[in-house]
């Protein structure tokens, strides 16, 4: 069954609200074509046989690969320096010998930031509505460890994943944007 969400919340819990043509690929070689979308708040895929059919949520495990357009998704267990592991569906961005870069799609519900401007006193003020906000990040797997990619170059250097001089040179030459997948893939 699909999760029901508060209709008063602005936005949606999906990476992309529309169902896209995709494929479930199982370790045993079986493949299944379907319409898919990722519910990032539940970390589940929602699946339809065709546009008219009813959607249902599916759990995947490490033996299933999901392809939607050119993107590849898999369930991973990883640790970002806390006591317990996280389990999440990650989008494969770039896999090299020593490094692997993944996108970890996440959303959270937040109350909108209050503006400092006082509204005129009409005796009625509309209560602020909660909204779905992007909380995604990039993850690097390196030497058996997992790192959440910071949004600043200074914090990136503090991770000590790369030679500082080479990183600075590469960053300047390629106008590296730590928030952009295409920029990160080089």
Where are these regions (language model features)?
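Long, compositionally biased interface segments
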Residues: 158-186
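Aromatic-patch recognition
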Residues: 15, 25-153
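Sec-dependent signal peptide cleavage junction
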Residues: 1-13
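Short Pro/Gly-enriched beta-strand edge/turn motifs at strand-loop
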Residues: 4-6, 17-18, 120-121
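Short boundary/loop segments of OB/S1/cold-shock single-stranded nucleic-acid-binding domains
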Residues: 9, 20-24
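Generic signal for short, ordered secondary-structure residues
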Residues: 3, 149-150, 166
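Short amphipathic alpha-helical segments, especially helix-boundary/capping motifs
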Residues: 19-20, 142-146, 161-165
């Amino acid at each position: 069954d699909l999760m029901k969400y508060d209709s008063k919340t602005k936005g949606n819990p999906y990476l992309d609200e529309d169902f896209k043509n995709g494929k479930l690929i199982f370790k045993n070689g079986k493949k299944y074509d379907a319409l898919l979308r990722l519910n990032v708040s539940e970390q589940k895929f929602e699946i339809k046989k065709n546009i008219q059919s009813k959607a249902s949520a599916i759990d995947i495990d490490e033996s299933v690969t999901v392809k939607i357009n050119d993107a590849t998704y898999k369930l991973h267990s990883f640790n970002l320096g806390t006591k317990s592991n996280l389990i999440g569906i990650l989008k494969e961005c770039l896999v090299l010998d020593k490094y692997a870069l993944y996108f970890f799609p996440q959303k959270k519900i937040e109350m909108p930031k209050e503006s400092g401007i006082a509204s005129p006193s009409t005796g009625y003020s509309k209560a602020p509505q909660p909204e779905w906000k992007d909380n995604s990040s990039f993850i690097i797997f390196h030497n058996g460890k997992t790192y959440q990619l910071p949004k600043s170059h200074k914090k990136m250097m503090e991770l000590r994943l790369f030679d500082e001089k080479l990183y600075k040179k590469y960053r300047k030459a390629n106008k590296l944007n730590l928030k952009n997948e295409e920029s990160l893939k080089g």
